[in-house]
Amino acid sequence: MQPYSDNSVNFRMMLAGYRAAARRYHAGRLTQDVAATYHPLFEALNWVVALDEQAGARWSPRGEPLGSKWRDEIDGGDHVDAVRFARNRAHHQWADALVLSEGFAFPITFPLVTHEWAWRPSTDLPKGKNDSGRLAYDRLLANRPARFSLQQLDETYSYVADLLERPSAQPSA
């Protein structure tokens, strides 16, 4: 896996960083340690934004990069819209967009966990000037566990990686 000709890191390399953070998040969910989940969740969500920027800058199916419009072209792009809405409202303070809940979230998965990070309702997010992505946020993220978002975003970005770059062996992360 080589960087792009301008020496930037390629999309699959960035996706591997996202996946490594998501794996650490899922492993941390099995502990009693809140930091073991928050730190990798914060990292994974920042990877989401970096991958979004790369997809918009690099994907040009009609000759010109699509920018944020790439999200309208594929299934799952609305999840990226929703996360971007949260990020823009929280101004990089992901703790303002997520809440730690104690107890179980449905559907129940095994092994059982004692805590779960979930997205706050949009009405609880800091106020902002731009409502772009709010409907997607309310529909897809609000009051739902972050783990569901991480899975959907992985599927979305895997598809984008196949569009941008030929599939090849991924680096271990």
Language-model segments: residues:
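Acidic, Ser/Thr/Gly/Pro-rich intrinsically disordered interaction regions
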Residues: 1-42, 63-173
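Membrane-helix exit/interface motif
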Residues: 52-63, 95
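Short, functional N-terminal and low-complexity linear motifs
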Residues: 16-20, 50-56
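Core of folded catalytic or high-affinity ligand/protein-binding domains
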Residues: 42-47, 54
